[in-house]
Swiss-Prot record:
S-adenosyl-L-methionine binds at residues 30, 72, 123, 194. Keywords: 4Fe-4S, GTP-binding, Iron, Iron-sulfur, Lyase, Metal-binding, Molybdenum cofactor biosynthesis, Nucleotide-binding, S-adenosyl-L-methionine. Its EC number is 4.1.99.22. Its cofactor is [4Fe-4S] cluster. [4Fe-4S] cluster 1 binds at residues 24, 28, 31. This is GTP 3',8-cyclase. The keyword Iron applies.
Amino acid sequence: MASQLTDAFARKFYYLRLSITDVCNFRCTYCLPDGYKPSGVTNKGFLTVDEIRRVTRAFASLGTEKVRLTGGEPSLRRDFTDIIAAVRENDAIRQIAVTTNGYRLERDVANWRDAGLTGINVSVDSLDARQFHAITGQDKFNQVMAGIDAAFEVGFEKVKVNTVLMRDVNHHQLDTFLNWIQHRPIQLRFIELMETGEGSELFRKHHISGQVLRDELLRRGWIHQLRQRSDGPAQVFCHPDYAGEIGLIMPYEKDFCATCNRLRVSSIGKLHLCLFGEGGVNLRDLLEDDTQQQALEARISAALREKKQTHFLHQNNTGITQNLSYIGG
């Protein structure tokens, strides 16, 4: 194995977020309010199963332990189950997760688990069916809830649920969410709304700091847990009276980037050192043949020397991120 991926600030990278499509069938207000529009960058289409196999093999050799498949909506790819199986071929990768809108969860989750999937994140921004419809543009609330139930039925011990925290939309619904997870092993993760190139007006209107929820959770006796090295950025809280957990993802908080442990590869094969970074490093020309792995690993390692200390979101920098489907959120 090559040496562990480490940047100039001594941060080690165990976690790859791999986008496999930027297509999505939902129209969430904070991401794709006008629906998916092809960007014109699909010169070769999205990464193939073989290309995904090669890029994840290289990252595994460089110390990656966890791969999250993202989009867009990953399950819209007809070969999604094959993609899971291809990533699973790497023994060094202990966790394979997906972030999904839950649209096909009920139908396909058993097949995904059989292929090697170990973790599921489902986006649910409201537990009110009408508000869910208003946020996503899809009247699929009951279908998504059935999908979460199906995940438990096929053997997943925990499901993570992502909720984008929005002022005057869902920030006042904490009690409703807590009731939902009291007897369910769901890690409910409130994610602060982030400003993107296309979402500045929405950000100004609806952003609220996750510190508001953190203060309330601590007041109610919730306990902050320690992070593991391949965990995502959430601050996780537990309570003895609840089967579920609460996670808070607060990218505007001081020192948020100090524990960064993840890199991103886009659906067209570009390595992004930060969700809000500039440009990206092309890897696709080194994904054509198995004999290119050493050169691929060298390019990834060299690129990491350019990773900045912080995302500079607090300075109103949004980089090239037009919307969160662009490189997988």
